[in-house]
Regions:
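Nuclease catalytic cores that cleave nucleic-acid phosphodiester bonds
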Residues: 2-154
Length: 154
């Protein structure tokens, strides 16, 4: 079973669902975000730790990776953070309920890099589709399954 659920809480649309699932699964949760996210609203909740970081744009990512152990689960939409998480022997899931995979993460990083280069050169790329209730439901089902598995990386 996962020891800890980390939530990259900068603009995470499923924080409430993730915390509820962690509580039901008896897994501790750690919210990590920059100071603009008002994590104080989670103070005092049993099984929830809120960590506010300051500094660069990747400060929350590095704070998560520093605390991560093999078998933990991270909720993030950041492909770079997901790659670091997988490299540390933990599991990662998007807010839309898609598990990141060690077999596809290199391709996802390459696509992200190519799109960044295209945008820097003045090109346009398609953004993500609107977040819908179906995404929220898929996330909840997949995260519940991951937290009940003996090895959430599977």
């Amino acid at each position: 079973m996962a020891t800890t659920l980390f939530i990259d809480a900068d603009a995470c649309p499923v924080t409430r669902e993730a915390l509820s699932i962690a509580r039901k699964s008896k897994v501790s949760a750690v919210l990590v975000a920059n100071a603009t996210q008002n994590l104080a609203r989670y103070a005092g909740r049993a099984g929830v730790e809120a960590i506010e970081v300051s500094g660069g744009r990747d400060a929350a990512d590095f704070a998560i990776v520093e605390r991560l152990s093999s078998g933990d689960v991270v909720v993030t939409q950041d492909i770079g953070l997901a790659a670091m998480v997988l490299g540390r022997g933990a599991a990662a899931i998007t807010p839309r309920g898609r598990r990141y995979s060690a077999t596809t993460i290199d391709m996802e990083l390459a696509v992200r890099h190519a799109e960044q280069r295209h945008r820097r050169a003045g090109g346009r790329t398609k953004g993500p589709s609107a977040f819908e209730e179906e995404d929220r439901e898929r996330f909840s089902a997949v995260l519940s399954s991951m937290l009940s598995e003996s090895d959430p990386r599977a």
